[in-house]
Regions:
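Accessory carbohydrate-binding/adhesion or oligomerization-edge regions at the termini
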Residues: 1-71, 148-171
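A structural detector for beta-sheet-dominated domains
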Residues: 14, 94-96, 106, 139, ...
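Extracellular beta-rich ligand/substrate-recognition surface
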Residues: 75-87, 122-127
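Residues that act as N-cap/strand-start positions at coil-to-secondary-structure junctions
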Residues: 85-87, 97, 107, 130
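Extracellular and analogous surface-interaction loops
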Residues: 89-101, 135-140
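Beta-strand elements of well-folded, non-transmembrane domains
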Residues: 91-95, 109, 151-153
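Beta-strand-rich ligand-recognition modules
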Residues: 112-163
Length: 171
């Protein structure tokens, strides 16, 4: 029998943030640190628009493409999405009961994933596209999923996206 697949449909995106090194990637920005107050308005950071209030994006067949929301304000096709950057995506998924699940992720570059404020994955994958399966426990009701994804100036820099599918496993 094929397992039931859930995927968050709507994501709140925040960013981009400077991310040139592992130290930068480990820097806690306001989406992952509730003690940091989000700015009230948009502001400029290193030649790119930094989004303080969320931009909402609907997933397309489980995919969230950061490049659609964080393109630089330059004309033409050169450098359309920021490199040496990271951004966050936040969504909720509802569960009818406490249950074990597997999060299937597809992504490029570095990623961190939290479920209900618990860090469940850190991956500093540098070469091409990667897939990871993460066992998690969903609680009855709303479950928060927060993803931080980087984009670097490498051969795959045009791919600043991730796919998130949740396979239910009955307890």
């Amino acid at each position: 029998e094929t397992p039931h697949v859930l995927t968050p449909y709507k994501w709140a995106l925040y960013g981009p943030f400077n991310c040139e090194t592992k130290t930068d990637f480990d820097q806690k920005e306001f989406p992952e640190n509730e003690t940091i107050v989000a700015p009230d308005s948009l502001h400029w950071a290193k030649g790119r628009r930094n989004i303080a209030q969320p931009t909402w994006l609907e997933s397309e067949n489980t995919w969230i493409d950061f490049a659609r929301s964080f393109r630089r304000n330059f004309g033409g096709n050169v450098g359309t999405q920021p490199v040496k950057s990271s951004a966050y995506a936040l969504a909720e998924i509802k569960s009818d009961k406490d249950k074990n699940a597997i999060i299937n992720l597809g992504f490029d570059d570095w990623i961190k994933v939290w479920v209900n404020d618990e860090l469940v994955l850190t991956s500093t994958h540098d070469k091409g596209f990667a897939v990871r399966q993460i066992p998690v426990t969903l609680k009855k009701g709303k479950n928060k999923i927060l993803i931080k994804l980087s984009n670097f100036d490498n051969i795959e820099w045009r791919c600043w996206a991730f796919s998130c599918r949740i396979l239910n496993q009955e307890l």
